[in-house]
Each structure stands twice: as C-alpha cells, then as structure tokens.
Amino acid sequence: MLLIESFYEGVRAATDQLELDFGYRTKSRLRAKLASGDEVGLFLPRGTILRGGQKLQARDGRVVEVVAAPEDLLEVRCADPLELARAAYHLGNRHVAVELGDGWLRIQADHVLEGMLIGLGAEVLPLRAPFEPEAGAYAHGHQHPGDGSGARIHMMGGQ
C-alpha cells in the first residue's frame, strides 16, 4: 500500500488522483484507492481538511492530486440578500457545513434542513456537485494568550 503523510507544495504535476467526497476529505487517517487503482493509506496531521486541487506527496515520491467528488447537495437561493443571510444564520445555528457562492448557499442533502429552508421562503434545488464548504473561523488555527499574539486575559478585580 502506498503511504501519504505530507502535502506537496512544488510545481511538479500530479501523476495520480484521489477522489473523495467531503466526509472522507475530513479524515486524517484513511484507506482509499487512487484513480489508477493503487491502494493508498493517508496519515495526515489531525484536523486536516483536504480540498480539491491540493497535492499530496506519497512516500515513494509520487504526487497525488485531491479531487472533490460530486455528491448530493442542496442549493439554496433567496429573493434578496437578507433572506439568504437569514437562511445562512439558521444553518450556522445548527452547525451545518455550508459552501458560499454568489447569491447561493450549498449544503449536503438533508430533507429536514430542506423543509426548514423552504419554510423560511428559500428556493431549494437538489444538485450533484463537488462540495467545498467554508472551513470555519478557526480552521487555520487561532492564538492564545502568551503565544505572542498580543491577546490578554483580563482578571476580575483589575488583576
């Protein structure tokens, strides 16, 4: 089995592809098959989210491109930006992964959320496409007091 433990940042073209849906692209430990049929084991840092187009470096030197596989999604559109913001708020309140586009939101297909969105007045269309949701506010890490970020802890009583 081919082992992949790191990302590739160079200019070499990929020689193979690893197609995964979003659920699998959030796994840092994974056994899968490349487009060539070769079996691969991913051992990436915990918390890694793979994105379509990223390149990985196999232990044998091969460069493998990540492909975001098409999956069942719902595209949400609204009559105006305020209604779309309201739909986004309610999805975020439920901690739903959301992909943002110009005038639309996309979520993984879910009949309960579909009903909620329709109830909010949104137009909801099923589609099959790659899913690349927002990574979240802390996806690139956040800083803590004492780490040089300038953050301060304010103690009660002015201490």
UniProtKB/Swiss-Prot annotation:
It comes from the Bacteria. Its main location: cytoplasm. It is found in: Cytoplasm. GO terms for molecular function: nickel cation binding; unfolded protein binding. GO terms for cellular component: cytoplasm. SMART domains: UreE_N. GO terms for biological process: protein folding; protein-containing complex assembly; urea metabolic process. CDD domains: UreE (cd00571). The keyword Chaperone applies. Keywords: Chaperone, Cytoplasm, Nickel, Nickel insertion. Belongs to the UreE family. HAMAP family: UreE. Involved in urease metallocenter assembly. Binds nickel. Probably functions as a nickel donor during metallocenter assembly. This is Urease accessory protein UreE. It comes from Azoarcus sp. (strain BH72). The lineage of its organism: Bacteria, Pseudomonadati, Pseudomonadota, Betaproteobacteria, Rhodocyclales. The gene is ureE.
